């Protein structure tokens, strides 16, 4: 959703929409979530570099540490305000859901 220069990407899961499949591995799901988010941001004229806030939702909070390498790869020098919530998700195959807010041209 766009509101001026703000881009809101709602909870995004690790589904690969080209194949309608989802990995059973949280690291792979995290990478796919971020690919899906990057695509949505690009369609809105934005990018990962513009992300100012991110929320992670995981059914099993102990798995979050496994996601760090992928998150560092995507966010690199971007340091958005972040929060992690431990909560069930709509589909038991989902191991992580990520939501971001971006401000276009914030870099």
What are these model-derived regions, one by one?
Residues 1-107:
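Short, polar/acidic, helix-capping and beta-turn segments at strand->helix junctions
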């Amino acid at each position: 959703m766009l509101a001026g220069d703000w881009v809101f990407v709602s909870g995004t899961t690790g589904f690969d929409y080209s194949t309608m499949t989802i990995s059973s591995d949280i690291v792979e799901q995290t990478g796919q979530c971020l690919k899906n988010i990057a695509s949505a941001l690009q369609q809105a004229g934005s990018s990962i570099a513009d992300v100012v806030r991110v929320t992670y939702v995981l059914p099993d909070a102990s798995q979050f540490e496994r996601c760090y390498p992928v998150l560092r790869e995507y966010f690199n020098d971007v340091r958005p305000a972040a929060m992690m919530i431990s909560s069930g998700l709509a589909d038991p195959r989902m191991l992580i859901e990520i939501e971001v807010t971006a401000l276009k041209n914030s870099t």
